[in-house]
Structures are given as structure tokens and as C-alpha cells.
Curated annotation (Swiss-Prot):
Keyword line: Fatty acid biosynthesis, Fatty acid metabolism, Lipid biosynthesis, Lipid metabolism, Membrane, Transferase, Transmembrane, Transmembrane helix
GO CC terms, sorted: endoplasmic reticulum membrane
Purpose of the protein: Catalyzes the first and rate-limiting reaction of the four reactions that constitute the long-chain fatty acids elongation cycle. Uses malonyl-CoA to add 2 carbons per cycle to the chain of long-chain fatty acids. Condensing enzyme that catalyzes the elongation of monounsaturated (MUFA) and polyunsaturated (PUFA) fatty acids that are involved in multiple biological processes as precursors of membrane lipids and lipid mediators.
Pfam families found in the cross-reference section: ELO (PF01151)
Membrane-related topology note: Multi-pass membrane protein
EC number: 2.3.1.-
GO BP field: fatty acid elongation, monounsaturated fatty acid; fatty acid elongation, polyunsaturated fatty acid; fatty acid elongation, saturated fatty acid; sphingolipid biosynthetic process; unsaturated fatty acid biosynthetic process; very long-chain fatty acid biosynthetic process
Protein name: Long chain fatty acid elongase 1
Enzymatic reactions: (6Z,9Z,12Z)-octadecatrienoyl-CoA + malonyl-CoA + H(+) = (8Z,11Z,14Z)-3-oxoeicosatrienoyl-CoA + CO2 + CoA; (6Z,9Z,12Z,15Z)-octadecatetraenoyl-CoA + malonyl-CoA + H(+) = (8Z,11Z,14Z,17Z)-3-oxoicosatetraenoyl-CoA + CO2 + CoA; (9Z)-hexadecenoyl-CoA + malonyl-CoA + H(+) = 3-oxo-(11Z)-octadecenoyl-CoA + CO2 + CoA
């Protein structure tokens, strides 16, 4: 029996590992921007395949672990958090000159309306690494379910949609990605550093977690403000900005839902219930 073309497309996994490694290890000098963007365009189906596999593995593992003791995974978790913290710090540092240089030299509006050299050279290399990293960050959830930590809708929804958006948007190179990527690098630099310290059993003041969540909310407020102004420019002026309507619509959907979910998380965690913790074990009575 012949399969539906869409089903066949989703089952036909094609990931050019050699090509991926060549771009990832190319380095910033003479970075092949066009080839980097084409890689994501050619492999967009991988994000849908990965999302389906991710859901099956995550919720399958959660079910499998329901009557079992949690894994500690101390050393792997320490290594994982350290890698993501170091990567995020490096990305934030490397992209800072281009971000603020564009604002200073071109103006605030132009910095999210136009691409300029955002995907060129060293900055382009780190943009590409950022987009690629969203596939690998799915592993974050595996640690949660194996250690029987709370798995919120916000967590897995955020991971899936960010990955899909990253791989879809980069080939089209919208100017406003400058803000989303740079701000995300900065926030993750703090967030994964915090996770690393906690996984190392290093005492961290309780207000730090609340501050990081607040920083995430500020990130999405800025992103939504940028998109709102671009929407105004697109509909009420003759501004010619560098983005496709489809990417803009997806970005609006993504950032507005993120803002709503993170505000709700903040209220539930720090205002109404007194705090949640990624590293707090699930009470045994909830494991049955």
C-alpha cells in the first residue's frame, strides 16, 4: 500500500552529517553564509521529524519512569550545563560588537528592520551555531524526565517551537532575528550558568531564579515590542524591511505565546505558589 507523500517525507530522514560538520567547524573566517542558510533550508524536515521523535521519547520515558526511582545523572548533567553555559557566554560575547555597533551606526529601527552584515563573518558563524544548537538543546528535557523533575508544557513547547522557528527563519534571514538571537544568548548565559552551579550543589541565592525568569520576560517584551513596531511600519508606512511575511507571522505567534506562558509561570511560581525549581524532585505521591 502506497504511503501518503507527506508521511513518506516525514519518514525519510536525510541529515547530511558531513556537510553539517564542515559548516560547524569552518570557523568565522570567510564563513560561508549562503551555504549555512541553505543547509537549514535543505534540512527543515529534520525539525518536524525531531519534534515527533522528541515527543515520543520524552513522554514515553516519563511513562516508563512513573514507578521507578529517578536517575541522578550528576556528572552528565554537570557537563551538559557547563557546555551550554560556556556556549551561551561565548555567543553573547562574540555577538555584542555587531549588535550594539549596528544600533549605534544605523539606528535602533534599522537594527531590527535591516539585516546588514548580521549573518556575515564571525557574527554569522555564531548565528549559525545558535540556530543549529536548538536541535541539540532538546536533550535538556531528557535529563528532566530521567531525573523525574516536573515537565511543564512551557518547557517542551518552548524547545520544539524555537527549533522549528530557528531552522525555518534563518534561510530567509529576517532583520529582527538580530534581537531574538542576541537576547537569547545573553539570557541563556545566565540561565545555564545558574543551572550549572545548582547541579554542582553550589548554593545560589533564591532570588537568582526569579531574576532569570524576569530577564526572560524582559526578552520577550522587547521582542514583542520590536515586532509590533515592524507590524506598524509594514502596514502604515512605506518602510522596506528585510523579512518575509511568513517569518514575521511565525515570530509574532511564537513570542506572544512565550510572553504569556513565561508571565504565567512567574505568577504561578513566585507570586501565587512561592517558587518552583528545575532541580526540585517531584513528590512521591505524584509518581503513582
Amino acid at each position: 500500500m502506497a504511503q501518503h507523500p507527506l508521511v513518506q517525507r516525514l519518514l525519510d530522514v536525510k541529515f547530511d552529517t558531513k556537510r553539517f560538520v564542515a559548516i560547524a567547524t569552518h570557523g568565522p573566517k570567510n564563513f560561508p553564509d549562503a551555504e549555512g542558510r541553505k543547509f537549514f533550508a535543505d534540512h527543515f524536515d529534520v525539525t518536524i521529524q525531531a519534534s515527533i521523535l522528541y515527543m515520543v521519547v520524552v513522554f514515553g520515558t516519563k511513562w516508563f519512569m512513573r514507578n521507578r526511582q529517578p536517575f541522578q545523572l550528576t556528572i552528565p548533567l554537570n557537563i551538559w550545563n557547563f557546555i551550554l553555559a560556556a556556549f551561551s557566554i561565548a555567543g553573547a560575547v562574540k555577538m555584542t560588537p555587531e549588535f550594539f555597533g549596528t544600533i549605534a551606526n544605523k539606528g535602533i529601527v534599522a537594527s531590527y528592520c535591516k539585516v546588514f552584515d548580521f549573518t556575515k563573518g564571525e557574527n554569522g558563524y555564531w548565528v549559525w551555531l545558535f540556530m543549529a544548537s536548538k536541535l541539540f538543546e532538546l536533550v535538556d528535557t531528557i535529563f528532566l524526565v530521567l531525573r523525574k523533575r516536573p515537565l511543564m508544557f512551557l518547557h517542551w513547547y518552548h524547545h520544539i517551537l524555537t527549533m522549528i522557528y530557528a531552522w525555518y527563519s534563518h534561510p530567509l534571514t529576517p532583520g529582527f532575528n538580530r534581537y531574538g538571537i542576541y537576547l537569547n544568548f545573553v539570557v541563556h548565559a545566565f540561565m545555564y550558568s545558574y543551572y550549572f552551579l545548582r547541579s554542582m550543589k553550589i548554593r545560589v541565592p533564591g532570588f537568582i531564579a526569579q531574576a532569570i525568569t524576569s530577564l526572560q520576560i524582559v526578552q520577550f517584551i522587547i521582542s514583542c515590542a520590536v515586532l509590533a513596531h515592524l507590524g506598524y511600519l509594514m502596514h502604515f508606512t512605506n518602510a522596506n524591511c528585510d523579512f518575509e511575511p511568513s517569518v514575521f507571522k511565525l515570530a509574532v505567534f511564537m513570542d506572544t505565546t512565550y510572553l504569556a506562558l513565561f508571565v504565567n509561570f512567574f505568577l504561578q511560581s513566585y507570586v501565587l505558589r512561592g517558587g518552583k525549581d528545575k532541580y526540585k524532585a517531584v513528590p512521591k505521591k505524584k509518581n503513582n
